[in-house]
A protein has these predicted regions:
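Short phosphate-coordinating micro-motif centered on Lys-Gly-acidic
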Residues: 41-47
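Cyclic-nucleotide recognition modules
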Residues: 73-130
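Cyclic nucleotide-binding regulatory module and flanking cytosolic helices
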Residues: 1-38, 77, 82, 87-90, ...
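Polybasic "coupling" helices that flank or enter modular domains
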Residues: 102, 122-185
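A short beta-strand-loop-beta hairpin characteristic of the jelly-roll/cupin
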Residues: 61-73
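Glycine- and acidic-residue-biased ligand/ion/polar-headgroup-sensing regions
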Residues: 50-63, 79-80
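Short, small/polar residue-rich loop motifs at catalytic or cofactor-binding pockets
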Residues: 28-29, 47-49
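Phosphate-/nucleic-acid-contacting segments
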Residues: 162-214
Length: 214
């Protein structure tokens, strides 16, 4: 659908296709869009996923719930991000986590089967493989964060990643405190206490989701 072309371009999916061929590639793919309300599940863990997903508007988080009811946030996907690729590209095609809308969100779906039939299959597949590699790097980075013993170190490493990404010492954590705590695998109270200590010690400053590394 032509209205999703800009989102698809921004996702990088067509980056190996010549610009004048974008419309041709778009018309060969089976593309649908769907709106979800905040808190709605796009997929649950173990659901079958046979399509790639791109955030058109809003944001999505992947999370896992453990036996005791504890929730860990794995990743946050913002506008134009591709997600659920590891499931769609796998042999079993089962979701490794729950994918939940962080806000009112619109998702673009592209079935893997339509990519396989597309004239530009090779170009698109190359991009998807690069995306998978990038996702693996992000997972490695999170393992490094969680491998830190001290909560303060975890916070600083995460903020430093955002600083490098945004090119500024003032960054935005697009999670509320509960979600940020779940991402760092700690309680909300522990996170709030540590953030307040760091603020008093003038290591960071913050107001809601806005953080500044001092």
């Amino acid at each position: 659908m032509i209205k999703y072309l800009e989102t698809i371009i921004e996702s990088g999916l067509f980056e190996k296709i010549e610009k004048e061929k974008y419309i041709d590639a778009l018309e060969q793919l089976t593309i649908t869009g769907k709106k979800f309300n905040k808190g709605a599940a796009i997929f649950y863990e173990k659901d079958m996923i046979d399509r790639i997903c791109i955030v058109n508007r809003g944001s999505v988080r992947s999370e896992k719930m453990y036996a005791g009811g504890e929730i860990h946030i794995l990743e946050l996907y913002e506008e134009s991000a591709i997600f659920a690729l590891e499931a769609a590209a796998s042999k079993r095609r089962t979701s490794p986590a729950d994918y939940i809308c962080n806000e009112d969100t619109t998702i673009v779906f592209i079935p893997m089967a339509s990519i396989s039939r597309c004239t530009y299959k090779s170009e698109i597949t190359d991009v998807l493989m690069q995306k998978l590699a990038g996702d693996n790097i992000k997972k490695t980075r999170k393992i490094e964060i969680l491998g830190e013993r001290g909560l303060r170190n975890r916070i600083m490493i995460y903020l430093d990643v955002l600083r490098k990404k945004e090119g500024s010492s003032v960054v935005t954590v697009k999670m509320n405190r509960e979600q940020f705590a779940q991402y760092l695998c700690v309680s909300r109270s522990a996170l709030s206490n540590e953030l307040n200590k760091m603020k008093r010690e003038k290591i960071i400053d913050f107001n809601k989701e806005r953080f500044e590394i001092l």
